[in-house]
Amino acid sequence: MLNLEYPNFEKKSLDELELKLSEPIKKINIRGKKKEFFTKAGKILSIILPIEPNTGSSNQQFNALWLSPDEWLVYFNEENNNIYNKLFNEISRLNFGSIVDVSNQWICINIKGKKTFDLLSSGSPFNFNNFKNTINSVTQTLLNHTDVIIHHTEINEINLFVRRSFSEDLWLWIKDSARFI
């Protein structure tokens, strides 16, 4: 397996806002439509995959984010490394669905504080009015012209997923913009 190097983002605390890199975490893209897919995924992850658009579901270990009618992003701490193998062996190998490790494609940035949604609104066309009141909501949008996935985990706290190649540019924009809100 490749030895992944994560961007060197220093934790930043500003007035009512905290920014930090939330890595390493495992990120798996799962796809499927068959009944067996949902049964196996639910049993292995001990979670029901969300079927409503722009929602997520969570338990003590795993977070599952709805991306499309047959696609989810599941993320969790690296300690559960054998989960990928279980999912792959019981779903992909049996042609019930697709399991792809995308950990090295996405970087997770955690943003929390009272000004979280002010910061996001300053660089996104998405209207966060309803989003910020619904925990476990998910959106795929643009932030400073960069594709992101945003998971609302707690009140005034989000996990923002950005492609690795855009992560440093977006991090610099976030730090700079946070000073002016």
Where are these regions (language model features)?
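Basic, glycine/lysine-rich polyanion-binding surfaces/domains
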Residues: M1-I181
